[in-house]
Amino acid sequence: MKTNTIITIGREFGSAGREIGYRIAEDFGTKLYDKEMLARAAKESGICEEIFESHDEKPTNSFLYSLVMDTYSMGYSGNTYTDMPINHKVFLAQFDAIKKIADEGPCILVGRCADYALESYKNVVTVFIHADLEARIRRIARIYDLTDAKAKDLIVKTDKKRSSYYNYYTNKKWSNADSYELCLNSSQLGIEGTAKLIEQYVTLKESIKNEDRVI
């Protein structure tokens, strides 16, 4: 099964978004990029990969956000890039890496505002995966060998970081249905079923002509 579509996956912590992405990538014969986006950005920017990891989907302050977005929207020269604060460099290098990955062909991109970075691309399907809290607690407790209470605390903190990061760097709201093309509760169909549903959606969308999508 082949596709010409790039799929971005936002996800609640513990919703199995990455695992769902791996199933789709395997079925479509495409690559999945998660932490690999950080490695790619580090290699192309010359910034240490550990720095990307330390800033990965972490919130920043509103002043830095304005500085970053002004520079990104106006374009930047090599000299300007060199003089940027490290948070600024990391953000722009990651966005550039996402675009370059997308330019190489169909793939799955997990997190890191990939949907926003590629909003001008026509062959993109943006997905958000959520799940019932109880299911997420069980999953995280099992994976990390935690008590339910500690698993819940980790979920709340991780989701808060992801939400703050996304809301700062985009003009949208993390987890809000209006921010994505497709939102799915993985608790209802499981990993395999959710992956299949996304694949069916992508395949159907590719088969429908633009003029037939008018409502």
Which positions does each model-derived feature cover?
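RNA pseudouridine synthases
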Residues: 101, 114-120
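NTP-dependent small-molecule kinase module
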Residues: 95-99, 168-215
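Short beta-strand-centered segment that lines the nucleotide-binding/catalytic pocket of NTP-utilizing
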Residues: 31-42
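Small-molecule kinase domains that catalyze NTP-dependent phosphoryl transfer to phosphate-bearing small molecules
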Residues: 57, 61-68, 72, 147-191
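Glycine-rich phosphate-binding P-loop
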Residues: 9-22
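ATP-dependent small-molecule kinase phosphotransfer cores
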Residues: 42-106
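Conserved phosphate-donor/acceptor-positioning beta-strand/loop module used by diverse small-molecule
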Residues: 120-142, 148-156
